[in-house]
């Protein structure tokens, strides 16, 4: 819910795709290379390269250049530019239409050493904070619901045991970034709903936010049951509204070095020589295009369905990306909803050829990350099914990239 759904390892940022500001690195996932899959030989399926490219475009919902209508934009508008969650949820999910119940203080959950240490940090900045319920106690973050007076709030703290994590420095950097993002939103209000900042302690990694009524659009990173079509439309509208927002360029920073990401996945065998060359070719054409403000972790678990509309939470990865990064994340986790994927693909290409190419670059890198997160030894049957689906999606995205390169 409010805790981060990704925990990449730190990387050095050296991309030329950035607004005029210093770049901030986006970490990569834990280096556990998946078993290499043999590349399908060209023509092995009995179809020509053009036929396979057209099939990939069709499956992704992308029209061929000959049939695609010209891009339409509002006057003056620019081209729109996992880990599996750790910790344990201590509150059962609320089903749609289920009435809210009175929350009671759970003394046992509030008395664990980690929670007590977190509450001590919260009390330093909010002495009036009254804890009510532990929403999540994980190895990286602790979430405690409570009140300040009559106002419901949520306190998010870095877990004490995170000090022993090999990614501790990156966890601290991400937490500091999220605090900075919430403070920036106080000065530059975004056009989407998000929890209001109540208080923050940058040094102790404590963040107190308004508690928004609602339920997550999904509990899992890759949900089996997708939201309803109406909910999907509302979520996509919220994401696109954020992506089209143009705050001052010095308020946020780039969060992903695309060239370095391509090189990293290429070095571990997830991308072939041709894959890496095709992606670099698309990147070359996007080198001088605008970047887009993205949430950076637009999973369904980071979106609340509230009575007033969708609410976006967990802003640790917010920043400048190539256009369509949030759409690529949503496409990757909505494998069971063909209609939603079609909507996402249509939105991705609505900005023209450059927006389509940027979406494809994002999609391949996001799928490589998901495969790297889940394709690990000891996976259960359900996870192996999901891994096979991710490999199929990645092959589809590769073919679409090759088709896009062929139209340049």
Which residues does each predicted region cover?
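Juxta-kinase regulatory segment immediately upstream of eukaryotic protein kinase catalytic domains
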Residues: 2, 57, 61-65, 76-132
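Active-site activation/catalytic loop segments of kinase-like enzymes and analogous catalytic loops
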Residues: 324-353, 363-380, 393-394, 398
